[in-house]
Swiss-Prot record:
<dbReference type="GO" id="GO:0002474">
    <property type="term" value="P:antigen processing and presentation of peptide antigen via MHC class I"/>
</dbReference>
<feature type="disulfide bond">
    <location>
        <begin position="45"/>
        <end position="100"/>
    </location>
</feature>
<dbReference type="InterPro" id="IPR036179">
    <property type="entry name" value="Ig-like_dom_sf"/>
</dbReference>
<dbReference type="InterPro" id="IPR015707">
    <property type="entry name" value="B2Microglobulin"/>
</dbReference>
<keyword id="KW-0732">Signal</keyword>
<keyword id="KW-0393">Immunoglobulin domain</keyword>
<dbReference type="InterPro" id="IPR007110">
    <property type="entry name" value="Ig-like_dom"/>
</dbReference>
<comment type="similarity">
    <text>Belongs to the beta-2-microglobulin family.</text>
</comment>
<comment type="function">
    <text>Component of the class I major histocompatibility complex (MHC). Involved in the presentation of peptide antigens to the immune system.</text>
</comment>
<dbReference type="InterPro" id="IPR013783">
    <property type="entry name" value="Ig-like_fold"/>
</dbReference>
<keyword id="KW-0490">MHC I</keyword>
<dbReference type="GO" id="GO:0042612">
    <property type="term" value="C:MHC class I protein complex"/>
</dbReference>
<dbReference type="GO" id="GO:0005576">
    <property type="term" value="C:extracellular region"/>
</dbReference>
<protein>
    <recommendedName>
        <fullName>Beta-2-microglobulin</fullName>
    </recommendedName>
</protein>
<keyword id="KW-1015">Disulfide bond</keyword>
<feature type="signal peptide">
    <location>
        <begin position="1"/>
        <end position="20"/>
    </location>
</feature>
<keyword id="KW-0964">Secreted</keyword>
Amino acid sequence: MARFVVVPLLVLVSLFGLEAIQHPPKIQVYSRYPADNGKPNFLNCYVSGFHPSDIEVDLLKNGKKIEKVEHSDLSFSKDWSFYLLYYTEFTPNEKDEYACRVSHVTFSTPKTVKWDRNM
């Protein structure tokens, strides 16, 4: 009988322990195809390895939020950390600057990562 009480208690303690663990997101910004000025492409922001799941991701053009952005469903890895992909169509050129801005409880201020067209 004691075994049936201890096991559920251990499960509850484990679950509450997961909520206390915080991991900052890894942010990767890249284009689907190699950058070619004037040719349509997709800008991607892959955010991974974060916990808890509450996160805000914005794609930026010249520091301003891009409104027409799509994203994958929130998913989790074997280690219970989360990941997401945000993406939008764009046409690269020499003058515009693109970036991904992420807000998460592990950051004191939002973190912005610029797109490097040479990556």
